[in-house]
Amino acid sequence: MDKRTKIIATISDKRCEVEFIRSLYEAGMNAVRINTAHVTTRSAATIVENVRRVSEKIAIIIDTKGPEIRLTGMAAGFESGIPIEKGQLVRMKGTAEDRPSSDQTIYLNDPTIYDAVPTGSIILIDDGELELQVVDKADDELVCEVHNGGVIKPRKSVNIPGVPIDLPSVTDKDHEFINWAIDMDIDFIAHSFVRKKSDVLAVKKILKDRNSSIKIISKIENSEGVDNIDEILDETYGIMVARGDLGVEIPAERIPVTQRLLVKKCIESKKPVIIATQMLHTMIEHPRPTRAEISDVANAIYQRVDAVMLSGETANGLYPVEAVATMARVAREIENDEVNNGPNIDMNLVRINNEITAQLARSAVRASINLRVKAIVIDTLSGRT
């Protein structure tokens, strides 16, 4: 029995040999993701060429850097970072230039940060490793109290939960890679940090101007994107639930609830949905995943997601082929369970015109599973069947 759930594997330019890609494909990989934040167009082209040498059936997705807040580089003497301690006051300031940070002032790449962030806001650095709170605002700087100590390292990510940030949706680097993707006939663009439909429309305009049919997958990575999911779904081809940054923006215990909500919305809208981040994270360093990770993959498949994604597991992990094979085995097992024990599907999730049509659809799905048919062919005049 072949699996229906697709597996996306992130490939790095540091490890993209034809034989390596072939081994992932034979293990069950269906699509390759290229993270443009870590490659050049030249090195990305090598990945694409090698993927196509393996099989034209492998879809290719490029992941844009997107609009994100980051720290700047460090001044001389602070190249390895700036140590901070709990209770210490730190001054932070936005800049349009790449001004180096020091122990006097920490700079961020968003010049509007002073006006956008109110007193009392929490600032998270490096995916939440460091937490600060804004206690005062003075001289165009945010005065922040350190909640947990550590080292502020250069160019780390910055999240400010609950605070809408007005950054350009498409960066200069994104423009470069989107146009490159058009030239290379890439299949999908996964656009990062989508907050509202205008972010999707900005990418659509670039594609339309060049008469490109590349599909857009919107990455939901913040609470604003979750709040605006309905308008985003109106414009996007599909959704990626990117649980890494999302888990920093919202409380960890809300992640399963939010994932279920987003999957349900996608099914209702008949839009593909991908679950990403730390699905088999243990396999970056270990040959076997935890039981919790297996259950995470299984639950995503039970929720009827279209694809599950591997990031560091295949990009730089020690057991990339084993990770893909493990995910494929889980997918087959869950799908086989549905064949033997009945589909875990609620047809009411899908917007169907009336109850008669809904009952016919339910019966057709269950009959096809019980009889193990390969396809359902529908003859329709109205298009609503």
Regions found by a protein language model. Give the residues of each.
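Non-catalytic helical/linker scaffolds that mediate oligomerization, partner binding
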Residues: 1-385
